[in-house]
């Protein structure tokens, strides 16, 4: 067997073991219907289990300087932008984002390169050894769950990379997300809107409290939250932790010149006519907070300037307004909550005001599908409903999406059993000057991306 095939087999073996933590030791899924109180209790337990393991593993989360990013929308893009600029400044930069589109190795990046298959397998084996010793130590806990294990693996890996900085995207919420066990030099809170309501809600103020939780004692934070009631929650958290909070429209602002150019008045400097790569207009706000965030790090002497904003000129974000075909024009965008969908629709109107749009959409259960469709449907001319294939996460029946669309509009709507069939159908229906959009779920976009960028290659 050659080394490449051996690496692939090792990768799959170790990833299969990691994924086995999705179930309990009896093989049952942890993800079952729960009340809000049960979900809160589970999140507290996840924090306690992960903290216990990290202490046993010599606290890898404390062994690198970090920027922590949360928010309902834009946190992945902002994380990537901050990472790109840090790398452009010659700094060895680690990046963790979640979820991945096609390969789990995407979640572990250094200077734009994902961990290798062999490196991933080795890392999981290292984790398994520590996990086994921890489990046998007769402590309170003896087994991490999948998300907790991923967090621990991420911290172990980042600690091994001799980084100048790490940028870590929170998974869900913030306060009770296991990534929040990591000390950070800066907290970034992009915005607060409705998402993961059953776990973080029910009110926007509840969600804001979860996001505010990533603010650390005596460490700066920055936010683009502007709603007074929600901003007050962040401000109170910062005051309690004696942390300086920098706010959009108070401490920093930005001006949009065109679809790819902004000027940012940051807390400590002004950044004139910054070019932002071929991305949707909604990414300009993300670029502004990313620039202001690094400006704050420089201002607090945690980073030596100048900031390399030129790194944003060629910035692209897989699965966000990503073009994969020209004739017909096909875009992939993982907008999966109403807030993200509104931003996507505005960008489409701005960039393609005259194009007819066929949207392929699908979602996993527990997403606000009806609310998302209320935003999407008026902006498109045809919908093909399908279902992402995600192990352990049931998808919304495409027939339900079809029925919802029919209640909202008279546009043509059909169903397809999978994304490949949906894309084939869309390409048969759409004219050469029309636009095909795959959206509604990052999982769906990841599957669609496989049609143009096969993992095997």
Task: Pin down the residues of each PLM region.
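ATP-dependent carboxylate-amine ligase catalytic core
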Residues: 7, 28-47, 52-55, 59-63, ...
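Active-site-proximal loop/hinge segments that shape catalytic or ion-binding/gating pockets
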Residues: 441
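C-terminal helical cap/extension that packs against the catalytic core
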Residues: 227-242, 329-330, 338, 373-435
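Hydrophobic anchor at the beta1->P-loop junction of P-loop NTPases
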Residues: 67-71
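Acidic, Mg2+-coordinating active-site environments of NTP-dependent enzymes
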Residues: 134-138, 161-169, 184-273, 287-306
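Hydrophobic positions on the alpha1 helix immediately C-terminal to the Walker A/P-loop
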Residues: 77-81
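Nucleotide phosphate-binding/pyrophosphate-handling subdomain across enzymes
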Residues: 165-170, 177-180, 184-188, 192-196, ...
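Beta-strand->loop->alpha-helix junctions that form or flank phosphate-binding loops
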Residues: 96-99, 224-225, 237-256, 276-281, ...
């Amino acid at each position: 067997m050659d080394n490449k095939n051996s690496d692939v087999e090792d990768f799959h073996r170790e990833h299969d073991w990691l994924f086995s933590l999705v179930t309990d030791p009896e093989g049952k899924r942890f993800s079952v219907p729960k009340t809000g109180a049960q979900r809160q209790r589970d999140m507290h337990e996840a924090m306690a289990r992960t903290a216990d393991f990290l202490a046993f593993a010599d606290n890898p989360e404390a062994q690198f300087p970090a920027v922590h990013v949360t928010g309902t929308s834009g946190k992945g893009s902002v994380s990537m932008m901050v990472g790109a600029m840090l790398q452009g400044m010659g700094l060895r930069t680690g990046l963790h984002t979640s979820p991945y589109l096609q390969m789990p190795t995407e979640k572990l990046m250094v200077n734009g390169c994902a961990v290798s298959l062999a490196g991933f397998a080795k890392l999981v084996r290292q984790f398994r050894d520590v996990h086994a010793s921890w489990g046998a130590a007769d402590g309170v806990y003896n087994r991490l769950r999948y998300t907790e294990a991923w967090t621990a693996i991420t911290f172990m890996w980042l600690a091994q990379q001799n980084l100048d900085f790490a940028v870590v995207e929170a998974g869900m919420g913030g306060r009770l997300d296991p990534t929040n066990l990591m000390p950070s030099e800066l907290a970034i809170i992009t915005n607060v809107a409705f998402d993961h309501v059953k776990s973080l809600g029910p009110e926007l103020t509840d969600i804001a409290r979860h996001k505010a939780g990533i603010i650390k004692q005596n460490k700066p934070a920055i936010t683009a939250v502007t709603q007074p009631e929600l901003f007050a929650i962040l401000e109170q958290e910062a005051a309690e932790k004696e942390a300086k909070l920098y706010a959009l429209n108070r401490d920093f602002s930005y001006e949009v010149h065109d679809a790819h150019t902004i000027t940012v008045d940051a807390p400590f400097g002004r950044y004139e006519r910054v070019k932002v790569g071929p991305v949707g207009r909604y990414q300009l706000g993300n670029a502004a907070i990313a620039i202001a965030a690094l400006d704050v790090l420089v201002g607090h002497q945690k980073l030596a300037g100048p900031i390399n904003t030129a790194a944003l000129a060629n910035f692209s974000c897989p699965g966000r307004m990503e073009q994969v075909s020209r004739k017909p024009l096909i875009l992939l965008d993982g907008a999966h909550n109403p807030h993200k969908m509104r931003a996507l629709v505005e960008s489409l109107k701005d960039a393609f005001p005259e194009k007819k749009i066929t949207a392929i959409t699908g979602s996993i259960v527990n997403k606000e599908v009806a609310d998302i469709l209320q935003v999407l449907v008026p902006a498109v001319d045809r919908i093909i409903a399908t279902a992402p294939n995600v192990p352990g996460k049931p998808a919304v029946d495409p027939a339900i999406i079809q029925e919802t669309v029919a209640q909202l509009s008279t546009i043509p709507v059909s169903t397809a059993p999978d994304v490949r069939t949906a894309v084939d159908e869309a390409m048969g229906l759409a004219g050469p000057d029309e636009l095909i959009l795959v959206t509604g779920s990052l999982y769906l976009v990841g599957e669609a991306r496989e049609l143009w960028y096969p993992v095997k290659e």
